[in-house]
Amino acid sequence: MFHSHDLIGIGMEADRLRRKLHPHNIATYIIDRNVNYTNVCTEYCSFCAFYRPKGHSEAYVHPKEVIYQKIQETLDLGGTGVLMQGGLHPDLPIEWYEDLFRSIKQNFKIHLHVLSAPEILNIAQISNISISDTIARLRDAGLDSIPGAGAEILHDEVRQRIARLKCNTEEWLSVHRAAHRLGVRTTATMMWGCGETVDHRIHHLQLLRDLQEETGGFTAFIPWSFQRDNTSLGRFVKEEATSVEFLKTLAICRLYLDNIVNVQTSWVTQGLKVCQTGLRFGGNDVGSIMIEENVVSQAGARFSATEEDLRHLIRDAGFIPKQRDTLYRTYFLN
């Protein structure tokens, strides 16, 4: 299918499956905020323009007061959650995260969708405890769910080339498997267009499909295309994915991952119009208004959206807009 020129036919098949899984003509969005608590990282991924090494003049670790302010601003805008991630800081043990999460939960009623698989592995290593114990302790401290970041392409041949210091494929899967077994829901992602082959993408999708069959713990799948500006990988990947490539990939992902209920169409990397079209290529969710986003924006993504922008693009595509929470529950009166 990746080699097919029948874009409309592939899109129609994906839309047919989307209608089967979501028969009420609803498309969803969320109001939340990305909070990047630190940009210090030891991984130096070639596709990332966000990280700074420890000791760099632009390196930071946000104090609680800054994070609290960001959370309050999110709540004031009608937000329901924060997506909190950072670099792999070499000096922050699990106690630092436990204290932060507990203090947030004591002060705010908000969903904590926090820490990627590489971050959890980093915390486990620093703290000298198992992955399962790390997740259990973080869950007990206030972690509600885990984002799917750090997957990139789940094939070690690709990972060695673009992120050789980051966790390998099996390690990423092991974090999500452990989380699901502990009752913690997670999302799955794919960053494509970084020089991988079609076979690499299919391998990635098959691994996610197999894990979902095993655990049922993924709430959603979010694919996005590599943004090359200001990244070292951008010197080798000369062209970013086109809108046609995005829509075809989105549709194929929807068809392949028929056991993951929700698939997000991205406006952050592709813009609002392509995102809107994606609702007819298998997507049922348009993501967040993104009150704050620092990672892909530093790699060249420059799109922005308000809540009304997202509601309008959903209505204009023929769907009923519904605000959801991080776990894809739509109990809001809108």
Where are these regions (language model features)?
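Conserved Radical SAM active-site core
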Residues: 52-203, 207-210
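Generic secondary-structure signature for well-ordered alpha-helical cores
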Residues: 3, 16-23, 50, 76, ...
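Short, small-residue-rich loop/turn micro-motifs
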Residues: 39-41, 49, 78, 149-150, ...
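N-terminal pre-triad scaffold of radical SAM enzymes
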Residues: 11-54, 59-85
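Conserved short loop/turn motifs at secondary-structure junctions
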Residues: 1-2, 31-34, 86-90, 192-195, ...
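Mobile, glycine- and charge-enriched loop segments
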Residues: 26-27, 31, 37, 41, ...
